[in-house]
From Swiss-Prot:
Pfam families recorded: Radical_SAM, RlmN_N
Entry-linked InterPro entries: Aldolase_TIM (IPR013785), Methyltransferase_A (IPR040072), RlmN_N (IPR048641), RNA_MTrfase_RlmN (IPR027492), rRNA_lsu_MTrfase_RlmN/Cfr (IPR004383), rSAM (IPR007197)
Catalytic activity annotation: adenosine(2503) in 23S rRNA + 2 reduced [2Fe-2S]-[ferredoxin] + 2 S-adenosyl-L-methionine = 2-methyladenosine(2503) in 23S rRNA + 5'-deoxyadenosine + L-methionine + 2 oxidized [2Fe-2S]-[ferredoxin] + S-adenosyl-L-homocysteine; adenosine(37) in tRNA + 2 reduced [2Fe-2S]-[ferredoxin] + 2 S-adenosyl-L-methionine = 2-methyladenosine(37) in tRNA + 5'-deoxyadenosine + L-methionine + 2 oxidized [2Fe-2S]-[ferredoxin] + S-adenosyl-L-homocysteine
Organism: Lawsonia intracellularis (strain PHE/MN1-00)
Residues annotated for [4Fe-4S] cluster binding in this entry: C116, C120, C123
The Radical SAM core domain, residue ranges: 102-337
Disulfide bonds: C109-C342
Stated name of the protein: Dual-specificity RNA methyltransferase RlmN
Cofactor note: Binds 1 [4Fe-4S] cluster. The cluster is coordinated with 3 cysteines and an exchangeable S-adenosyl-L-methionine.
Length: 358
């Protein structure tokens, strides 16, 4: 059987027309039942004749992960621990904000891998090691589950407004499945996320950056975290195999849409990369790129050797960047009290469980 969540709309339409010998509008009806109304029970798709429902039941399945736990932070952030069909565990996070009209808007942080191979020394996920890539269906199912949880079924007034690939894993090391997932997210007949509402964050995988530049399916964020190659080699040893200056040159040739900017992410580690000298070096590195910089104070995590920077050092760092003409945003981390903030995603459930899933 075919997992409907794992295929794009053109593939699904072809399946309905060629295999079931039905009209294309039937494909659209089914697709909208799943992706807009979050109906995953085929028998509940009431505008389909019984014959089609029976044929569809024999042809496709809709595999959703199991929700193991949901934790809610004092700031409203929610972290979902999900169990996939093979028992693997991943996390996805819902981050709330309030728009100008006073409505709640959610940014969802998605995982792209089980674990991560990059080994960044400040990241809790890195301690899991790399287990496997997620399929496109496993990526987009995180969104479907979140929409079900939120009762987010009004396409003209969505609650989940933005998607960020900043969860577990390096998205651009899972480029094939990531690209398929982006096409599913984009489908105007379904979730209808435009490129400007999706951000893919990477440690700096050049091949993947070039692919994202060509396909234009999402905005780009670069996890920089260091102002020079030597420092990056220390705190991001595997990512540092891509020379920093070559990486910046790649970004200078990145194809940007109108009003699009590259986002640079810089995690401030107390006493490591947070001096005014680092700020000057950083400004020089990125000054020729159309972008903006997110400053992220480090969130202390169990077992990690780093400290949170002082408020004084944070402000000094930001002041230097502003003086050099770098648009700099001090990002407030949410979900710290449930280990859902930047760098804290890790399936701690494993260590709390007496059973082993592998």
């Amino acid at each position: 059987m075919i997992n409907l969540l794992n295929i794009t709309y053109p593939e699904f339409e072809s399946l309905i027309v060629t295999t079931l010998q039905e009209k294309t509008y039937r494909a659209m009806q089914i697709w909208q039942w799943v992706w807009q109304k979050q109906i995953t029970d085929i028998e509940s798709m009431t505008n389909l004749p019984q014959k089609i429902r029976a044929s569809l039941t024999a042809l496709i399945k809709i595999n959703l992960p199991e929700i193991v736990t949901i934790q809610q932070s004092s700031d409203g952030t929610k972290k979902f621990l999900l169990r996939l069909s093979d028992g693997a565990l991943i996390e996805t996070v819902l981050i709330p904000s309030i728009d100008k009209a006073g409505n709640i808007r959610i940014t969802q942080c998605l995982s792209s891998q089980v674990g991560c191979s990059m080994g960044c020394t400040f990241c809790s996920t890195a301690t899991m090691g790399f287990i496997r890539n997620l399929t496109a269906g496993e990526i987009v199912s995180q969104v479907l589950l979140a929409k079900l949880h939120l009762n987010d079924n009004k396409p003209d007034k969505p609650i989940i407004r933005n998607i960020v690939f900043m969860g577990m894993g390096e998205p651009l090391l899972n480029l094939t499945e990531l690209t398929r997932a982006l096409h599913i997210l984009h489908s105007e007949k379904g979730l209808n996320f435009s490129a400007r509402r999706i951000t893919v964050s990477t440690c700096g995988i050049k091949k993947g950056i070039q692919a994202l530049s060509e396909n234009g399916l999402a905005f780009l964020a670069l996890s920089l975290h260091a102002s020079n190659q030597e420092l990056r080699s220390t705190i991001m040893p595997k990512a540092a195999k891509w020379d920093l200056k070559e990486l910046i040159d790649t970004l200078k040739n990145y194809s940007l849409k109108k009003r699009e900017k590259i986002t640079f992410e810089y995690l401030l580690l107390g006493g490591i990369n947070d001096s005014p000298e680092h700020a000057k070096e950083l400004a020089k590195l990125i000054t020729d790129i159309k972008g903006k910089l997110n400053l992220i104070p480090y969130n202390p995590a169990q077992g990690q050797p780093y400290l949170k920077p002082t408020e004084e050092n944070i402000l000094k760092f930001q002041k230097v960047l502003w003086s050099k003409g770098i648009v700099t945003i001090l990002r407030k981390s949410k979900g710290q009290d449930i280990n859902a903030a930047c760098g804290q995603l890790k399936t701690t459930y494993l260590s709390q469980s007496s059973s082993t899933i592998y």
